[in-house]
Each structure stands twice: as structure tokens, then as C-alpha cells.
Amino acid sequence: MKAFMDKDFLLETEMAQKLYHEYAAKMPILDYHCHINPQEIAEDRKFENITQVWLGGDHYKWRQMRSNGVEEKYITGDASDREKFQKWAETLEKAIGNPLYHWSHLELQRYFGYYGALNGETAEEVWNLCNAKLQEDGMSARNLIRQSNVTLVCTTDDPVDSLEWHEKIAADESFEVRVLPAWRPDKAMNLEKTDYLEYLKKLEVVSGVKIDSFASLIEALRIRMDYFAEHGCSVSDHGLEYVMYAPASEEEIEAIFAKRLRGEAVSRADELQFKTAYMVALGREYHKKNWVMQLHYGVKRDNNGMIFGKLGPDAGIDCINNYAPSSEMADYLNALAITDELPKTILYSLNPTDNAAIGTIIGCFQSEEARGKIQQGSAWWFNDNKQGMIEQMTSLANLGLLGNFIGMLTDSRSFLSYTRHEYFRRIMCNLIGGWVENGEYPADEKVLGRMVQDISYNNAVRYFGF
């Protein structure tokens, strides 16, 4: 029997061990998509206790605590941090096979030097150890980033954001890690939302544009894109129900938008036509600016109305949406490609059954502009577990070029989540090592070592051009 999460954790062959320890492990991290609050980096936040780091905004953990029958007061309510940690520890011991079990223990090992198992009985010991460690200077937000060997972080930012915290970080020469904004303009697209007109007023203020037409909406966004670009932004991100394509004329789009500006509701057909026009218009802008476009789709959000009413979005009540016609995604990409205005694009579906569809679609739109211009994104959200990563990389290898894959991202709100890169690299090295062990690829250490280093870091550096 193997030891619990030792140095060869998840590395089943000699080649896998060699590739990870001698090549992948030492590579830096380029975290091109996360939800970390830049204010916490600017102010170099120190955390009072492990609950603040682990449970403050982690809806992955909240879901499992609810699944364990934990009262909401111990999850997002007014229970003490020690009580919340106890409930999490009692939940974690039941999470065999869940990535949260592995992530949590990798974090305990790497940042706190704890190699035991966290459960209800050890909670007090771990609580005291972690909290003592968190008082050290080396455990501040910036130092956690430094010790994780991170070179660059892309946060997730709305077009109306001031980016003041990014400015403060950039002006501080004592912090060598680049922290750049990433453009997330979902609120300007979601005209079906009840607060849409309120949002447009905010966009008018920051852009200086009177938004009285679809054309003026795009102009306001273009001005904000220029502002983001001045702050180093070259990455966009969209959260979509699915990648739709319902084309309409300019006149039809203007009529739909005018109806919404009057405070009237729009039909589902109108909504899809508007969103299509919006995504095509922004895709063209990204191509002009040489930005990378990320499309996250296949989500049905905020399903539990009672919890949503109390906590709002990002509360752990989202699920997979299995309606995502690949034909419409292909048509959307083609609408940009046919006029040579398709930017570098990364496609992420929450539904693992979309892996093969994505793999075939990206092969239709590659070009000499970049190696792997159109990427299948790393296994995302409910898929960033051992099996999900294996399935995503295997599908990509079956249908494309795994050697050009840009690899992992944290997609997290926590400064301890960089161990997800280690988790990914171990799984990736084990997958490749297994193919070599099985005689499916030559045991050429030089070629293989370069490949795993590229997937771990170098491909992302080349692709994004930071």
C-alpha cells in the first residue's frame, strides 16, 4: 500500500515520477484566470485564521458542507470561525475521491507543513497549527503568491471597475509579481436582468458615452477596453449559458435594444439575437487588440431560489446545463473567422460530454497566427478533478495536439489554491508517463521533459504574450 499523499502522490510509473520531479514541479505558475480580490494583494492582507482563508468565499466547500447536513449558520452564517472550521473538518473526512480532499491536504502540506489527515478529531490540532503559521510575515497575501512561484496573476474585472488596486500594485516596486486585470463584460450583455438599466448608467458614467443605441453601447465598451489595455489587460472572459448564434440585422438589434432601454421586457428570441450581436462585436474588438477571448459556458446558475435570495450569486447553487449546441458555437466562431476577425480563443464547457465536440471545433479554426490559436481550456469547475482532467487531456490528445495545451489555472478566490497547479501537473505527468510506459510514445526524456514544462508554463507564456 502506498503512503498517504507522499512525494510520489498520483505518480504511478517511474517515467511519471521523473517527469514531475525533474521537469514539471520546478516550473513557475502563470495564473491567467482567477477570482482573487486585487485589493487583498495591494494591501498585502494577513489572515487571522484558517477559516478566513478556506471558507470565506469558497462555494466548492459550501456545497459539500450542505451535502453533509451542516446548518447554514456554520457555512455562511454567524457561527464562529472555529465552529465553521470544525464543521468543515467533519465534512472533509467523508470526501474520499473528491478533489477538495486532495487540494485541502496539499495546501496543509505545502503552506503549513502538516502531513496528517484533517478530520473532526484532528481539527483542533490543525486549527492551532495553521493559525500560528498564519501570523508569520511569510503568510501574507503577497508572500503566499511569492512562495508559490507565481509570475503573473490575471484577476476578473467588470468594465466599470476603476482598476485602482491594479494601479497601486503596479506602482509598488517591492512586489515583483505582475497583477493584471481581465475583462469580464457579462453585465453589459445580460439585458434580461432586472438591474440591466442601472448597470448601463454606471457604464455611461465611467465611459463618458450616452448609451442610447446598440452602437453607443459598443462604443462605451470600446472606450473601457482601451482603459483596461492601458492597465495591461489583454485577456477577456465571458460566462455564457451557451455559445449561441442567432444572427439578426443591425436594424433588428437596434430595435431590440431600444425596447429594453424603454424598460420593456424582451423575448427569448430577442435576447439571443442581441447576445449574438454583442459577442460578435466584442470578438472583433478583441481581434483588433490581439486580446485572448475566453468562453466559459454550459452553466445553469442560481438554481436554489431560497439560498439565492439570502446569499446572492456564487453561493454554491449552480449546475451543469446540458443544452449547448456545438453547431451554434461553430457558427459563432465562423462569423468571426470568415472576415479574418477571430481572436485567440479558449473554450471551456462545464459539461464533460462536450469534450469531443470542442476538440473537433477547435480543429476547424486553427491558423498560422499562433500554435494552438483556438484552445480547449483546462477541465473547469466541476471537472477540475482527477477524472475530469484525465478525460479532458485524453480527449484533447485524441483530437488535437496536447503538446500545445496552455495548461492549468486556479479559477479560485483563495491564495492557497496554487496547489491546484501541482495537482494538475502530477495528473498530467502520470497520464503522459503511462502512455510512455505502455509503449505508445518513445521514452525520450528530453522531448518529454520539454513537453511537460511547456504544458505547465511555457505554452501559456507564449500564447498570452504577457
Enumerate the predicted regions with their spans:
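C-terminal amphipathic alpha-helical interaction region
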Residues: 293-295
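Short glycine/proline- and charge-enriched loop/turn segments
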Residues: 308-316
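Hard-cation-handling environments
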Residues: 299, 304
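Short, basic/hydrophobic alpha-helical segments
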Residues: 332-338
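Divalent-cation-assisted or electrostatically stabilized phosphate/pyrophosphate-binding catalytic cores
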Residues: 323-329
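Metal-cofactor-binding active-site regions of metalloenzymes
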Residues: 2-289, 341-343, 347-359, 363-466
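Metal/cofactor-centered catalytic core regions of large enzymes
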Residues: 270, 316-320
